[in-house]
Amino acid sequence: PETHEIVREGIESFYLLAVDVARIGCQTVCVVIKVFPNDTEWHFNVVNIYILGKNDSEKVFDHQVLELKRLMEKFHPREVVIDINGLGVSFADLMIKETFDYERNIVLPAYGFSNRDEYEGIQPRGCEKILYGIKATGQINSDMHSTLFAKVYSGAIKFLISEQEAKVKLMSTKAGQKMK
């Protein structure tokens, strides 16, 4: 897994972060994707997956937003896609504000949405607009599933480990043994 931006000379690439927002009883997940664009088809590597707010005291959105902004510092993503349905709206509201990092005694910047008109008047002027908010509907979910399925099976998306490695690891656990 990659833990920060890695730039290789002569290889065009950039990072995307995708965030599914959750709170009590569930986990907010940030998937780090490295994109390799070319003339005919883009390729995608999932290079890391982070859980934001690993324990109960860190599940509050203030802390999750701080963790995400720290990841943004490390990966310098071109875009950060956030699920802003339901609870995600509160998360989004904090992303458009500055965040104080108490551990490092610094202020992390506010970011803006590039695609959501409802944030245009309230996000800070001049902020970097790299947030992309998704309010999924049944149709959008269906379209995303179809596109993802096609990309995975065409080989355009690579994961942290292969399907075979994942099966071997899963089957070596007690939970995996119950799936036989």
Residue positions per predicted region:
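RNase H-like, metal-dependent nuclease domains and their acidic two-metal-ion catalytic environment used
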Residues: P1-S114, S142, S146, A150, ...
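Conserved RecA-like helicase motor-core motifs
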Residues: Y102-K135
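Glycine-rich anion-binding surface patch
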Residues: G138
